Amino acid sequence: MYHVNRIYPKKELSQCFISSSHITDKIVNYAGNISDYSIIEIGPGLGTMTYSILNKNPKRLISIEKDSRLMPIHKKIVDEFNGKYEFILSDALNIDLRTIIEPPVKIIANLPYHIATPLLMKWINYIDFFTSFTLMFQKEVADRIVAQPNNKNYSILSVLIQLLSNVYKMEDFGPEIFSPQPKVMSSVINIIVLPKPRFNVNHNKLSQVLKVTFGERRKMIRSTLKKLINNTDEILQSLNINNNLRPENLSIEQFCKIANSI
């Protein structure tokens, strides 16, 4: 399809286009009802996912794309869906989505893999603005997002996302659905935002705890937490947390208790 449009994917933008509407329809269906929601799509590419979204009749769709070569394709879609679709030529990392759309909002996207994690970390800062995210990630990143304690993939991302939402891996996809084919597997995940965080916690302090512990994840927390807490052993004992544990063994609640003790 990109050959027909004379648009060749740029490696520096992590462009891997999905040309099959069967696949994009399936991804959009994972988002559930969208007719009562405004939708944001990041990296719409050749518009296959864009059409899948618009065909499910959202209140409104805004797509954000950095590659100006794709503008003519999306101008045609704008004209076709008069008033329903808006195309913004910009870098999504530089946009506060709260300034361009009104809630309720869902994000549906095949994210460019090189900015997928930075985008998600940015959106976490105002996650209560959104209802849900249905996102295609590199499988390795998706596995980190949904990982539970005592799993090698359990990470800072796991804790921060799951503190604020319910996460579900919907489906894994092979490289063959993309053009060009990446060298990795991909996964679609659903992130359903909770009405409030699972536990009350100071998010700045939690981030500090996560950084010092996962920064040296093979070390026991009694060692790494000394960078933040003087009387580490006493505090961990008072919280009934084994000081010989490593960060991948701690629950989200335990991380929050430690953060609240600083």
Curated annotation (Swiss-Prot):
Coiled-coil intervals: none
Organism of this sequence: Ehrlichia canis (strain Jake)
GO cellular component assignments: cytosol
Alphabetized GO MF terms: 16S rRNA (adenine(1518)-N(6)/adenine(1519)-N(6))-dimethyltransferase activity; RNA binding
Principal cellular location given in the protein's record: cytoplasm
Name this protein carries in UniProt: Ribosomal RNA small subunit methyltransferase A
Keyword S-adenosyl-L-methionine tagged: yes
Family from the record: Belongs to the class I-like SAM-binding methyltransferase superfamily. rRNA adenine N(6)-methyltransferase family. RsmA subfamily.
Role this protein plays: Specifically dimethylates two adjacent adenosines (A1518 and A1519) in the loop of a conserved hairpin near the 3'-end of 16S rRNA in the 30S particle. May play a critical role in biogenesis of 30S subunits.
A Pfam cross-reference name: RrnaAD
Enzyme Commission code: 2.1.1.182
UniProt KW Nucleus keyword: no
Residues reported in the UniProt entry to bind S-adenosyl-L-methionine: I18, G43, E65, D91, N110
Reaction(s) catalysed (UniProt annotation): adenosine(1518)/adenosine(1519) in 16S rRNA + 4 S-adenosyl-L-methionine = N(6)-dimethyladenosine(1518)/N(6)-dimethyladenosine(1519) in 16S rRNA + 4 S-adenosyl-L-homocysteine + 4 H(+)
Group of enzyme by EC: transferase
Keywords, sorted A to Z: Cytoplasm, Methyltransferase, RNA-binding, rRNA processing, S-adenosyl-L-methionine, Transferase
Compartments reported by the entry: Cytoplasm
PROSITE patterns: RRNA_A_DIMETH, SAM_RNA_A_N6_MT
Disulphide linkage map: none
